[in-house]
A protein has these predicted regions:
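Short, exposed beta-strand/loop patches in secreted or surface proteins that constitute
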Residues: 115-117, 127, 162-165, 169-170
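Beta-strand-rich binding/interaction modules
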Residues: 144-161
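Short amphipathic beta-strand/extended segments with alternating polar/hydrophobic composition
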Residues: 136-140, 149, 166-169
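Short, surface-exposed secondary-structure junctions/capping segments
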Residues: 62-63, 69, 157-161, 169-172
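Loop/helix patches that line or flank the sugar-binding groove of alpha-linked glycan CAZymes
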Residues: 1-135, 141-145
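Flexible, charged surface loops at secondary-structure boundaries
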Residues: 129-131, 150-151, 171-172
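Ordered hydrophobic segments in well-structured contexts
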Residues: 123-125, 135-139, 157-158, 175-180
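C-terminal beta-strand-rich structural cap/linker in extracellular carbohydrate-active enzymes
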Residues: 165-181
Length: 181
């Protein structure tokens, strides 16, 4: 589900350290069952298909005939591709780009920002802090709305549904990530 992937990227891009996005993750390339391993990936072979650049027959990756491909492509008619997603404001690729820009603009979310977990209850709530700022991150991948008490600040960014802060309580829709600072 694309909405869940967006929330997962919010989690990934709000963690300390250098985030790692493997090619195709940003467009939601899928695992393709039953591909022959050509590079010893075996269990990962289905996640190593060529990049899907566009919606052409060969996904913009090759001009070769299908029987000459070194690694098979995702043959699905609805396979995601970079060109289409770059044209859609609500696509996974567009959200990932916005999240990267948000991370770069906020020192607390960058590699050296500290992390502290608020509790071990659901939803996942943690604080990212730097000398310049503190951001509370709420990750709610579930379908139900949640409330989180004792959060100060205003909503800086949301992924998925909507969220509000009222009197120190965050109310967030299901399948939503919220950044409050």
């Amino acid at each position: 589900d694309t909405d869940e992937l967006k929330v997962a990227f919010a989690f990934l891009l709000s963690m300390p350290g250098a985030p790692f996005i493997y090619y195709g993750d940003e467009i939601g390339m899928r695992y393709v069952e039953g591909l022959t391993s050509v590079e010893g990936g075996y269990g990962r072979t289905g996640s190593r298909t060529p990049m899907q650049w566009d919606d052409s027959l060969s996904a913009g990756f090759s001009a070769a005939r299908k029987d000459k491909y070194y690694i098979a492509l995702d043959e699905s008619a609805d396979r995601p591709n970079a060109k289409t997603q770059s044209e859609q404001e609500d696509s996974l690729r567009s959200e990932v780009k916005r999240l990267i820009a948000f991370r770069k603009a906020n020192p607390a979310l960058q590699s050296k920002g500290e992390i502290s977990f608020v509790s071990d209850d659901y939803p996942l709530v943690y604080k990212r802090t730097s000398a310049e700022q503190e951001i509370t991150v709420i990750i709610n991948p579930g379908a139900d709305a949640v409330t989180v008490p004792n959060v100060n600040g205003k909503v800086l960014y949301t992924v998925g549904g909507s969220a509000v802060v009222e009197k120190g309580i965050v109310k967030a829709d299901g399948c939503t990530a919220v950044f409050v600072g």
